[in-house]
Amino acid sequence: MAFDFKKKFKKFYRPSEKPEIIEIPKMNFIAVRGKGNPNEKEGEYQKAVEMLYGVAYTLKMSYKTQYKIEGFFEYVVPPLEGLWWQENVKNENYMLNKKLFNWISLIRVPDFIKKEDVEWAIKCATEKKKKDFSKVEFFSYNEGLCVQCMHIGNYNDEPETIQRMNEFAQNNGYNIELTEKRYHHEIYLSDPRKTDINKLKTVIRQPVKK
């Protein structure tokens, strides 16, 4: 059976709706950086997601090609994730004007995948699909201490959940630490094209410090 990050690391991908403090270890991803409203049709964000999945599945299926990745084992492609921020906005109000978003769109990769493997997959996907995948990069993120919980429902209702998370952190002696290297983080467990908007499951994390 293929390795599934969501099942193996439930504390990272299946938290409860009750906020908790958690230490997140360093993880490796493929990533695309961009700006703007993620809901814009055929916009930069949607193109980034398409690029990520193209490279993610090229890596996943690499064992069927002549290219061999040392230590490879079959795995389920992990869910789409995103790091989000706006310049000079450090509270939940950053959600209000989506066209001002900066973002790094992510898909986790197993530890056996290295930078050179991602570079191979970019080249392979470009040749196969006749599209530009050059914005995809290998990205390591050492997230550290966070407040985390599951948000169920519309993405537009996230500020209420974030406020509840922030209050929980502060009531337990932690401060929210949004910086140039620590970001608001979301993991998308549901496909919005196939899921009732009120049942969308999103893991939300906010970086904290004591």
PLM regions and their residue ranges:
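A solvent-exposed interaction/effector surface
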Residues: 1-210
